[in-house]
């Protein structure tokens, strides 16, 4: 029953990859639900807290989520549904359940391209995002993005302008419109594509959800395009996820004197593929999707009308005054305009050189995790067990700490300061 899928997906203190291991061991969520407590021990990696959460058979929360889905007209896609993206099953921590609005595309039969970038994009970045979104769609690709203001939204508008569907992946409940200024875009994506979230309806857009959802954007995509990203942009998390998942990373080269291109230009230095048109991306998948990618409709950089581009440029939100300066900020005195922005876009790693300086600047949960890591390298599951925090919150907080330059990921699911 679908309620058992929701029950398993919402078990606290169990990582997504362990939930998949449970699913593989017991064949389906109903078997997991009705299993004897001792049988859970066959799944390696479960913490005592995780075992306790599996012993909790109360279905009221799952039933409420299901009722909320009916009220909000949300549909549910499970890991074992035929429409579930096969590419996503190949990552280490796929979600068991998606809540969505709209119509699902053929995830496996079409080239999905993740398009990401900063919310505070330059006019050049905004117009280029829309242009490439349009071109990708015209050539037979599907744009996947996060529905944020800036690069995400403009890429999706470009795809919709081309008459193609788009896929939006949210860091909150699928019924929520965030940011509110993108309400018209949400309506269009729902009508012509789909809006998806691993988070149940009613989940607010809290900061730690966004880094977590980035693995989905990259995981269901063949490759990820970074249009414009500053040094500590959340888009770089998506690029790292893509690289870790074996996906291609593409980058639009940017002005070396503009801070909002520092991160994306660095990806080029590290081996990402430079892009000047959609064909630089889709040509990589021509053999994989010979009947879907339309080379004869590969469009030039002028294929979106100048009027359309001008409208996109006018829609671009002005950069904060500090961000418009052609220099990198002082390490010791980060400007307030940047500090006030969303955590994943902060300038970070250069600010924290000593653990004693770190702790006062961190949230209580971040402090717990940093304290747990002070003894040296730790497995992620050990950090979860020591802190007593929910697994999903630990993973998301670790990602935020990585963006700030506080922690470093190591092979074998290990973390260190």
Show where each model-derived region lies.
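Short, positively charged patches
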Residues: 1-138
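Glycine-biased, small-residue-rich flexible motifs in mid-sequence functional cores and linkers
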Residues: 79-417
